[in-house]
Amino acid sequence: MEKVLFLDSPMKEKPYGSMRIQEKFGFGLMDKKIGEYWVISAHDNGLSKIKNGKYKGETLKDVYLNHRELFANDPHDKFPLLVKINEIQEPCSVQVHPDDAYARKYENDYGKAEFCLWLDVEEGTKIIRGHSAKTKEEFRKAIEEKAWDTLFVRKLVHANEFVYTPAGTVHGIEGKLMMAEVQQSSDVTYRIYDYERKDANGNMRELHIDQAIEVTNIPHVEPDVHPIVTMLEGNEVIEYVNEKYFSVTRYKIQNEIHINNPSYSLCLPLSGNGILDIDGKEYDIQAGIGFIITSHTKRYFIKGNIDLLVSVPK
């Protein structure tokens, strides 16, 4: 009866990446520009493997499919969430994600709603958040005319701020930052604008204008989300979102804390280190190494100095 699953997870080379993820979390350096670290993933495009216990060496995908009792008998046919750390050193594409209905029909995948927490942010960094178009025709016309300055809405961001991005929301990043991301387990992205970058062979990445126009929320609607800050056993607790697909809560642990586990929890230590205690059995935990508290655990105890991001699927 496994109560916690520690994970060994893939890193993704991206044109906007760097070495900072590897440096920040003490991983071995690779001669690659890492833009995404899929900390907790059962998606076919990047599978986490179990590091401990009876399922050691198996993929999270297989364990989820074959041992649903570890995951509160979750009814989703595929593991529902994907947890990442992303590093942006150049503007990333302006993009939009479809909802479940569209993604299932055309991509055989989940749609994508996502939560992003900005960790390290260079001064002056902006995100693209929404657009100015009022109709699909106006949206298409602005794209055809490359009216990027007036079409896209930009906003300055700072460390420890967050955004919740429902499917259909146009978004992008201009500047340099590192972020933690919790999203539906989907790799479907429709690119609208990629800054006309070319790869080593002189080719530009594919754009998906027709699909983007089809799935974008027009006019843009900003979700109404507000964090709830409380104290638990002397530690600050921030519930960022509690939405349709997941909740995301941050525990800034300074000493020790007991945390209830309502079903199963996806845990990403953002910084620091500590001890995880489940029914008297102790495990070392450290920044950057993701783990899952299975539904066989009803409550867990953490001691140390550690900043922990916990997401719970719905």
Where is each model-derived feature located?
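Short, basic/aromatic beta-hairpin or loop at an interaction surface
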Residues: 132-145, 261-271
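Transition-metal
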Residues: 1-134, 194-223, 248
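An exposed, glycine/acidic-rich loop-and-rim segment of catalytic or binding clefts
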Residues: 145-151, 162-164, 170-221
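Ligand-binding loop in jelly-roll beta-barrel domains
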Residues: 75-78, 87-91, 110, 121-124, ...
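Acidic/His-leaning functional-site neighborhoods
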Residues: 226-283, 287
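His/acidic/aromatic-lined binding-pocket segments of jelly-roll/cupin-type domains
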Residues: 83-84, 92, 114-117, 154-155, ...
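Short acidic-glycine-tyrosine-enriched beta hairpin
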Residues: 152-164, 173, 279-296
